[in-house]
Amino acid sequence: MDKRTLFSKLPSVDKILGNDGVIELEKEYPRSLIVEVIREQIELARKRILELNESDMEGFDIDEDILINDIGHQLKLKYALKLKRLINATGVVVHTNLGRSPMAEEIKEDLWLIASRYSNLEYDIESGKRGSRYSHLEEIVRKITGAEDVLVVNNNAAAVMLVLGTMAQGKEVITSRGELVEIGGSFRIPSVMEQSGAKLVEVGTTNKTYASDYEAAITENTGALLKVHTSNFRVVGFTNTPELEELREIGDKYDIPVIEDLGSGVFIDLSKYGLSYEPTVMDSLRKGADIVTFSGDKILGGPQAGIIVGKKKYIDKMKKNQLTRALRVDKFIICALEATMRYYIEEEIAIKKIPTLRMLTYKLDEIKEKAQRLNEMIGRLGIPAEVKIEVGHSQVGGGLLPLERIESRVISIVPENMSVSRLEESLRLCDDHIIGRVYDEKYVIDVRTLFDEEYEIICNQLKSILG
């Protein structure tokens, strides 16, 4: 059989469209997309024929059933959402690459109701007049934090930029050289400050800064004192950093506002659950910060948002800033954040309902029980692999507690019929996208970050891949 004969056997687009299998596909996919994929598959087959040498042509044929099957597979890939749910088996609780914090299961009904119907986003039901989208969060945030007012924008970098742009545009903002952090993706506090229109004044050194350094740098053009919580790194050894109360005293003396950027931000004292102490939002407000900014989608366990709390007189000005409209959040964020905040009224409920907090506060016995359960389920599969429970260490992630290693339990897998790297790739690329770790020539699943329903999914994929 020569190439000309093979080319002649390629079906036309119209012929494929008339195939019963393709007619069924039209019930699921737009016809224009089907035609596009058919043309791509025909062109792909044509290229394969062109690349054939004489010895290959004898065994090569055009199988229309295989072509239709390939068309269906490609349609599924093209039409699927690019943002996919996956399984986090890494043990990093707030994994910034894997969607950060998972939200509470129970809020999905609230979200769906707001998303699929009209809402009072900017409508005051009591008066029948235009309302403010920010009013929905004011009461709950005040109740939890004790702040006078709140404003929510789309992320914490935006929150910092809005705060500085409102309170200190064209003025100097004093901050410690040791707190000029990079928050990820090459976004740095000095760059955010420059974009806001404020002028950075660095004081102190990388490892030591004193309150007197701040005071010595004050001029008639000083707009604010800024403290940045270095949540994503630690300077240890010969160090000093002024306490927030000290900056408050200086702020009062010179009538200068004090701003603290907490970065991740927490509402609960994590040291009660065996983790290192992290300043809470409430701590910062009690110690005298006029304005505190933090994230909604890290330890807090809500959607991506930059939350600004503090003195009403400053937040009122921010609400009037033209930049606020460009940075504002939509009804989904407001709904998800309000629903998440409700759990924080009672700490025990927050720990139980918010996945991030639940994962971080598991007792070791609970972790051991989770590992034993998964180990037994995998053991019943009879797969050709060495599988066992080992001691491992989880991480908080999200730029918080970078030195914290939380004792955990992992399932280590060493397959007999393929390499560990091949197993990692197969699990990552499977339909359920299981993301684990390769450590010490073993594939490792940390049970801390697994949801109960994911155990069976993992077992099914291991059985499919390893046989």
From Swiss-Prot:
Pfam families in UniProt: Se-cys_synth_N, SelA
Organism lineage string: Bacteria, Bacillati, Bacillota, Clostridia, Peptostreptococcales
N6-(pyridoxal phosphate)lysine modifications at: K298
A GO cellular component entry from the record: cytoplasm
Job of this protein: Converts seryl-tRNA(Sec) to selenocysteinyl-tRNA(Sec) required for selenoprotein biosynthesis.
Pathway this chain belongs to: Aminoacyl-tRNA biosynthesis; selenocysteinyl-tRNA(Sec) biosynthesis; selenocysteinyl-tRNA(Sec) from L-seryl-tRNA(Sec) (bacterial route): step 1/1
Keywords per UniProt: Cytoplasm, Protein biosynthesis, Pyridoxal phosphate, Selenium, Transferase
Catalytic activity: L-seryl-tRNA(Sec) + selenophosphate + H(+) = L-selenocysteinyl-tRNA(Sec) + phosphate
Any GO BP annotation: conversion of seryl-tRNAsec to selenocys-tRNAsec
Homology family: Belongs to the SelA family.
Cofactor: pyridoxal 5'-phosphate
Cellular compartments annotated: Cytoplasm
EC numbers on record: 2.9.1.1
Name of this protein: L-seryl-tRNA(Sec) selenium transferase
InterPro entries reported for this sequence: PyrdxlP-dep_Trfase, PyrdxlP-dep_Trfase_major, SelA-like, SelA_trans, SelA_trans_N_dom
GO molecular function annotation: L-seryl-tRNA(Sec) selenium transferase activity
